[in-house]
């Protein structure tokens, strides 16, 4: 009888282990405001799931390191891999590594360059960047009454989101309603608050005149705000817009410093990436592109988004 009971217990343990799912995730860099929200959302969601082990690694903004992490996940025999790419132009190699190993791969937040040719059992979860810069720039155009001068602060140039958001800006400013707005400067600050502040300081020192700051994310917009305040510029004299609707950005909006942001649902993207990875690991079909909607944030609807990111 004792042997029979032990046998049943062992079978239960084996069955439980067989159904456990291990997901390896390589994030572009931990030291990033939105990336931290995304990572925390993934970790919190994974904790609510029975039998799911989420292992997250920091790629430290190093493409070679990220590829090595993917190779290590493959060698460890994980059931699925999630990647927030360091360089969206380097994803073809990552896709091949996972496809050759027969392991599902989900890209999150940053669109891979090979999005239209992803192998089977691979997907992309994010928000549609056609909407992000478009929502942002249309609102800024409205606040400027369709005329004035603007400076543009771009994210990392190797990143598809930065390129797309910047294209959105140009597309909106080319419309009849907004073609009276001239871009007088356009440079990168690599998504970073400190670099955004440094860039704005340089523009102010050079005597660049502008009526609006259009930044590819909130962190760079906040950096620009800090530099403007340090230079004694009134926040009422300039329209400033970012993207992400982070807690810091919404605090700046409540203080009358930031005028426009666009909510990017970090928690929703994280949850969606894990759900897609689990479905693919079980042989279930998912859409190649899974979009979590962007939403415009202004002072009028600020309260709806506080505490979401």
UniProtKB/Swiss-Prot annotation:
InterPro entries associated with the record: Peripla_BP_I, SBP_2_dom
Superkingdom: Bacteria
Protein keywords: Periplasm, Signal, Transport
Signal peptide range in chain numbering: 1-20
Compartments, as annotated in UniProt: Periplasm
Example of a GO cellular component annotation carried by this entry: periplasmic space
Gene Ontology molecular function, alphabetical: carbohydrate binding
Family of this protein: Belongs to the bacterial solute-binding protein 2 family.
Function: Involved in rhizopine (L-3-O-methyl-scyllo-inosamine) catabolism. Could be involved in its high affinity transport.
Name by which UniProt lists this protein: Putative rhizopine-binding protein
Species this protein is from: Rhizobium meliloti
Gene expressing this chain: mocB
């Amino acid at each position: 009888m004792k042997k029979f009971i032990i046998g049943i217990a062992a079978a239960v343990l084996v069955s439980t282990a067989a159904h456990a799912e291990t997901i390896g995730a390589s994030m572009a860099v931990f030291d990033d405001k939105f990336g931290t929200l995304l990572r925390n959302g993934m970790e919190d969601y994974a904790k609510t799931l029975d039998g799911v082990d989420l292992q997250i690694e920091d790629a430290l903004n190093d493409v070679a390191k990220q590829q090595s992490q993917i190779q290590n996940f493959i060698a460890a025999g994980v059931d699925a891999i999630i990647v927030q790419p360091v360089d969206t132009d380097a994803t073809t190699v990552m896709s091949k590594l996972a496809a050759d190993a027969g392991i599902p791969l989900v890209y999150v937040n940053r669109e891979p360059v090979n999005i239209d040719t992803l192998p089977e059992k691979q997907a992309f979860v994010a928000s549609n960047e056609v909407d992000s810069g478009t929502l942002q720039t249309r609102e800024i155009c409205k606040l400027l009454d369709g005329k004035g001068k603007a400076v543009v602060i771009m994210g990392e140039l190797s990143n598809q989101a930065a390129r797309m958001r910047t294209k959105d800006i140009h597309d909106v400013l080319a419309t009849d309603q907004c073609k009276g707005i001239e871009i007088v400067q356009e440079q990168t600050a690599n998504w970073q608050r400190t670099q955004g502040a440094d860039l704005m300081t340089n523009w102010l020192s050079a005597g660049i005149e502008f009526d609006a700051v259009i930044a590819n994310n909130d962190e760079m917009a906040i950096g620009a705000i800090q530099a403007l305040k340090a230079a004694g510029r009134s926040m009422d004299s300039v329209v400033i817009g970012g993207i992400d609707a982070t807690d810091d950005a919404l605090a700046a909006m409540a203080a009358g410093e930031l005028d426009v942001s666009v909510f990017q649902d970090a928690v929703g993207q994280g949850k969606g990436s894990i759900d897609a990875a689990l479905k693919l690991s079980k042989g279930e079909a998912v859409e190649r592109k899974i979009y979590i909607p962007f939403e415009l944030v202004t002072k009028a609807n600020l309260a709806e988004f506080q505490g979401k990111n």
